[in-house]
């Protein structure tokens, strides 16, 4: 009986929110388990399902759309997606009566081990991450002996957990209408265009936001979507009966610190699961006794934002609570410690907090992915706990074909979940609680052997293991206070009752990853040893020229002494040639060079082994940070260590929380004749494929974070900037080239392509034609030609002998970059950041929001007053 019905996409104009866009293209898969009488007319049921599905799509045409990645003109970021009115919604029908019996499922309480994802689900993959469209929604009706398994698959970009529940509610209503004859064939399309703008209800409203305000979230680089993977044979559903749930609430209430402290039913369930899983992981040898444990929980912000119902889109805020394992292990207070942490974080969620996070995600949308930071800890110290407990799916009436009209169970398929994912299912009609745990087998075994856990889950109503799941007791490591293990007391105490109040609803979200940081060592500044006098030629570079380009330096002849003349012909600017001798104070402040270290000796100096990092005072307020690449033996090639150390420097700026910190960043070379030679191929040749992929992930993450900095960034390029070295410069807002600079993306000559942003950042700067020329030929572009095509914003050249020219060009490029940073930093700190934000989006809405953010600043008032008084304003970033 296998067949498929397609409902063509009705016309719609839907503007999804940014909060919808950033979710990975994974589908929520809910398996609704119905019983059917043996005499059921399946053909009649199929007709009614088809009619109901058709009318559900007409009411919400978005369900028949397609999810597509952002196009190149929208920024082409892999973490952003749109929903377009193309394609259709599918209802697939299968008859599996010879393979599955409802009675067998009921005996195991609908165990996930009997529910084959590939067989039952219309979109079985964990996620659809390729650059192609994927359906928003598919339903699959699976007839089994004595029942029907209806699978609802809706992509997360279209609806969050409550949104999916609302869709199911609409379908239940339409199915009842079809059975009563209120709706029937022929099926008519929707006559009008469905229009909605979710951004009016869910947005940051121009709030810039700060990621530091949100413990569960990060924008640290990582290919989080790639870490979502299948986990099989480690998924199990448990039940807490009504009596056991009452006992559990009493156990938690006994830990209350007074009448002003109360816990919800959800707090009791969540704390119990959190504590039990972490102790089981400890017994399984996965988690050390001194570990900090974490749980992330999604909170539905519809009530906080006062959003009218139904609203289908994503309005989820994720909290992150932490408690040391040693505290969880305390039998008398562990449950209370967990619940107390959960309650505090849930109470801390407000409309303002949600908008702050969304505002940050909107502001940084094209440069970095705002995501959850718990993914990497999911198999060790963290879990994500999603509660559907108050979503009344069991109360929905799907019509008389199912007897009483109600589902007998709701299940989620095991495939597509990962260790650390916990789902609390909707409250069962008898008042009991079911929850699904996905863990490593060793953890599941330890859970089953935990007397305290079994006390609440192993009564007559609880779910027993199927025959293939029955396991022998696991040999447990000694539980002592030594070597990271902790002592766990499993003797239950005597408990008294206290009334428990209810909890806010909680919704599911998608899972992302995190990275760690290492602080570089700080050392004292190095004394100056020698000064040099430099003759300079400076060129302000205007718009890209349409004139013929200069002769090309091919990679085979890329020597540091082969450069084009400094003079540049452009259509809109003239070359200004200035040759001067710097004054003693200028040399002391900017160009005094240590022969050994090649430092600009101002401010504190940090020297990780591959970098030289220091600061100088910025005009008005704050400092200018200067980072010099310093691997002379490897021509500043990007090693694993250099990428890590540079990431730490960039994150240090991201973590600053005040305007008086870093005002601008200058990146230069401490090595004559080269800016950066690209990836360290000597190091690369000894890497495995996994190590190479990990390095590329780190490099791409570094470049995304550099490009996402809210302050001006300037690359000072002297000598060769090849491959990843040029891509590093492309991440900066501005580029200063010395006359000996040679830029190239030669990867095609190595049978690869640029892989760290070159293919999309370069055309945004020099245009598609020039980018194609550079990438397809792999040729080296000299400084003068680079200036003509707009690759650099300043072109400078040094006079002097051939022996000193490479050194002089490097120093001059750095000096010019610092002067440019000082010139920018003389303006208002808030205004500079707002301008960068507006330019990053290049749209009216963001510009308007950015302008609003500067209207009420003290700096604006100070600037207006200074203008009236004909003096220079003092702008401090307030």
Curated annotation (Swiss-Prot):
<keyword id="KW-0456">Lyase</keyword>
<dbReference type="Pfam" id="PF02458">
    <property type="entry name" value="Transferase"/>
</dbReference>
<comment type="function">
    <text>Enoyl-CoA isomerase/hydratase; part of the cla gene cluster that produces clavatol and ortho-quinone methide. The clavatol biosynthesis cluster cla and the terrestric acid cluster tra are both involved in the production of peniphenones and penilactones. The non-reducing PKS claF is responsible for the formation of clavatol from successive condensations of 3 malonyl-CoA units, presumably with a simple acetyl-CoA starter unit, and 2 methylation steps.</text>
</comment>
<feature type="region of interest" description="Disordered">
    <location>
        <begin position="541"/>
        <end position="561"/>
    </location>
</feature>
<dbReference type="InterPro" id="IPR014748">
    <property type="entry name" value="Enoyl-CoA_hydra_C"/>
</dbReference>
<dbReference type="GO" id="GO:0016853">
    <property type="term" value="F:isomerase activity"/>
</dbReference>
<feature type="binding site">
    <location>
        <position position="724"/>
    </location>
    <ligand>
        <name>substrate</name>
    </ligand>
</feature>
<keyword id="KW-0413">Isomerase</keyword>
<dbReference type="InterPro" id="IPR018376">
    <property type="entry name" value="Enoyl-CoA_hyd/isom_CS"/>
</dbReference>
<dbReference type="InterPro" id="IPR001753">
    <property type="entry name" value="Enoyl-CoA_hydra/iso"/>
</dbReference>
<feature type="site" description="Important for catalytic activity">
    <location>
        <position position="747"/>
    </location>
</feature>
<dbReference type="GO" id="GO:0005739">
    <property type="term" value="C:mitochondrion"/>
</dbReference>
<protein>
    <recommendedName>
        <fullName>Enoyl-CoA isomerase/hydratase claC</fullName>
        <ecNumber>4.2.1.-</ecNumber>
    </recommendedName>
</protein>
<dbReference type="GO" id="GO:0016829">
    <property type="term" value="F:lyase activity"/>
</dbReference>
<dbReference type="InterPro" id="IPR029045">
    <property type="entry name" value="ClpP/crotonase-like_dom_sf"/>
</dbReference>
<dbReference type="Pfam" id="PF00378">
    <property type="entry name" value="ECH_1"/>
</dbReference>
<dbReference type="GO" id="GO:0006635">
    <property type="term" value="P:fatty acid beta-oxidation"/>
</dbReference>
<feature type="binding site">
    <location>
        <begin position="677"/>
        <end position="681"/>
    </location>
    <ligand>
        <name>substrate</name>
    </ligand>
</feature>
<comment type="similarity">
    <text>Belongs to the enoyl-CoA hydratase/isomerase family.</text>
</comment>
<dbReference type="InterPro" id="IPR023213">
    <property type="entry name" value="CAT-like_dom_sf"/>
</dbReference>
<comment type="pathway">
    <text>Secondary metabolite biosynthesis.</text>
</comment>
